[in-house]
Amino acid sequence: MQSVRWEATRLMKKSTNRKRTSRIILQSLPAVPVAIVVVIYVMSLMPCSTKKMERGAALIEHKSYYELTVSGKPVAWFDALTDSCMSDNIMLSADSSVTKRSIINGCWVNKYAFMPSCHGMILTTDPDSMAYKTLATANKNIGNVIKNTAERLESAIKSLSKKDEELRYYLSVHNVNDDGYNTMAYLDGRLKQQKEQAEKALEIIRKAQTAKNAAIRLVSKYTLLHKDTAGHTVRIACNTITPASEKPFRIIQTSDKQTPDNVSPTYLHQWFTPATDAERGIIVASYPGCMLSRYDVNGAKATTFSGKATGKSRHDIPPMLAPDGAAIYTSDGRMMGISYNGRITGTGNFGLALKNLLP
């Protein structure tokens, strides 16, 4: 009888231990994902090698132009704007004469600081960001802008007409055998083309004067210039994710939302990040000299350069080597921020999960 009681007691204790163990396991389950996230986050804080920094750099072509729209439909394209007038270089299409082109830097980034989440996203800059203030003022006074532009075109047409008359007189008193005749004939043809173009532009501007819903917008287009695994430069169209504003930074994304295999996106941490106002050694990863007018994109190669953070979020690396949009790391390989106007914009400025740059 006693042995039976002992056995029953033993079984009850065993059952109790099992319940206690199960309860501990169940209580611990929520901590498992947290622990995994912590481990991944800590791993993402590991220093980068210079090779990895170089694979994180991106080379981008930026193109921009202005459009005059009526009811949201573009009717004219031009290359420059003040708060009171459009340029007189107004075309009937967005051709190369009104399009500004520049080559800029960027860096591949992950959206989240604790897991790979690039999806083709690049942090870069907008060379025209400061123009949005002028654009806003011009649109508030769109009637005066259109009126002033019409007057400017009228003046240009008068000037072209006078020059054309002078050239035609020269041609009338000379013949084809005279020195310089062919050159003058060519110039006369060019003047007539310019005059015709200005007259067509003036016609469109005058129609816009009577429209109640005319507006001007600035169009920016980004194209990734990326070397594939074979070393060939491929062009990949990108979409702009960051809403247009006077702030300089933009998130762009490859049109297919894919990240090439041979790149290394960086993490923009919000905590435990190096201070940008301290004096320390730094490394910039960039495509040096990309702002040069005849920059060879096919021969472009990402490179790292050493320098110093000089305090007050500034650095001493020349703009030729540290263009706007280039990533800056500490000398031991920790992501520090982005170069812009000779300063270091810390990763904390972009917000958790890039919230300060996303819609």
Predicted regions and their residues:
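N-terminal Sec-pathway targeting helices
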Residues: 16-34
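Bacterial Sec-dependent signal peptides at the C-terminal "C-region" and cleavage site
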Residues: 38-51
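Catalytic histidine site
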Residues: 49, 56-214, 325-330, 335-343
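Conserved beta strand-loop-helix elements of the APE1-like EEP
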Residues: 105, 110, 250-257
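A short, polar/charged loop-to-alpha-helix boundary motif
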Residues: 344-357
